[in-house]
Amino acid sequence: MIDFQDVHKAFGPKRVLEGLSLKIADAETMVIIGFSGTGKSVALKHIVGLLHPDAGDVIVDGQAVSMLDRGGLTTLREGIGYVFQFAALFDSMTVAENLTLGLRRRRELSAEEIDDRVREALALVDLSGTEERLPAELSGGMRKRVGIARAIALRPRYILYDEPTTGLDPVTSAVIDRLMVRTREHLGVTGVVVTHDMRSAYTVGDRIAMLYEGRIRQVGTVAEIQETEDPVVRQFIEGRPE
């Protein structure tokens, strides 16, 4: 379980998180929505210890992330896959080499086991046979799928998705949504998805949380969010200007 406990974070005079509290249950997909600049990606970075709160804490599997030493952070991160907004692939490496980067740090895995994981992960995202291709040879949607495969190959307990459908056409976005749902069904992972895309949020989310002015404005099931009477949440999900 992931538990944000009254998390505060500021960058200089700019206060980004101001009392963020949110519990994410095992095996659920939580979607975090909110206006640009409200701290959604900042919240994700706290889960993996890339940022530390000024006050409060994030508890992952009973451990306070800010209290972990280097070894503890390494162990934590081995159980978390991170899908970046722009895939973050190394252009000079093949698809297979991009997937094996994290796996080669797992000393318990043999070369054969690593190759098997790469093949299995690519098959799960419908990219079998692309192992020797370079990122430049792939479409934007395919690169996003490679990013998901890289996370899957770690066999994590958690996968964090940062704007997974940004920059994609509606058809390709629907493919990515389907892959996120399939990943949860096949692997039983807990997912945290940051997005502005409400169609995607409704498709992949078990629950949706609206982050507004540094804290959670509302959290609920898809149906509860769709039927909300909160004016701020309503404005966002309907895409209405003020």
What is the meaning of each model-derived region?
Residues 48:
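Helix-to-loop junction immediately C-terminal to a conserved catalytic motif
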Residues 153-157:
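A short, proline-enriched helix->beta-strand linker immediately N-terminal to the Walker B motif
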Residues 65-81, 105, 111-112, 225-228:
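ABC ATPase NBD coupling module
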